[in-house]
Amino acid sequence: MLETLITKYRALGIDKQIDYDKFYLYSLVTHSTAIEGSTITELENQILFDHGISLKGKNLDEQHMNLDLKQAYEKAIEYAKQHKPITTEMLISLAALVMKNTGKEYQTMLGDFSSARGELRLLNVTAGVGGRSYMNYSKVPMKLAELCDMLNERRAKSATMSVDELYQLTFDAHYHLVTIHPWADGNGRMARLLMNMLQIEFGLIPAKILKEDKEEYIKALVTTREEDNLDIFRTFMSAVMQKNLQNEIENYISSVGDVPEVHDEGVEYQKSKPKKIKSKDKIVALLKDNNKLSAVALAERIGISAKAVEKHLSNLKADGIIKRIGPDKGGHWEVVEFTGMANTIPIVKIME
């Protein structure tokens, strides 16, 4: 179901609209801060981000929360494009951006630390009044390092993973980070940021958690933790993703009107006929973004058979557009020359 909706979303060209990447980023920021109590809307953030105009009736902390998270996302997107290894130091640097103007200094028996600098907590915290305590602060550095190692190991295998498996990996990253709770504040924003950073790296549509889903979102996290069952959070996130995609598709169709009919076998245009992106162009675009993708992974992303992909790869190689570096197993592709429509392939890249 999720993969079908993504195919329809991209076939309709929703992510090819002017300034789509910018506005999707603004939406991610707005909804993430709304979960934490911000009342700033997407339109208000557009004014704040694009024009630097202070918002009447909104306190400075709210505005700083949104401005800081936007800056953190921009840095995370850079890391995603560069396929940087995920490390404790990287997460601390991102947390410092998230909490730059709203963090504070803490004084403890073990020493002082600052959430504004992204420093790991030196005190224990609970999930609200009467809630269960998160892991002891002394275990945080080790558990955070283990999480980074696990994510890097699974990222290395991403080229062979299905879309559903990739989303599950990003949902798991979110859950594990918020469960470790490395910081005194900003853990929720950081967990959603890490999830979205991975989704952007994998060429997925980043997941949004809307304010109206906050209660169910928190329940899913708590229940997953209590029952030690990741499938609970995975199922919740998949359902939220499906609902949001369906709503965006319906809103797009109702506002545009003249849109293509999307079928399992492809896209059929009724009135206007935009130039259809060829499979070979999609393959080249995907290889430019990730040169280690296998034929199976390419087939799944494009929606054709692996055998068809292999034929396209052979033709592209013969035409001198791509070449193979190293052996079939362990090697990678290099894009030599391309003048087709690769830049129009529907891969979510939030920042240009």
Where are each of the predicted segments found?
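FIC/Doc superfamily catalytic core
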Residues: M1-D185, R189-E352
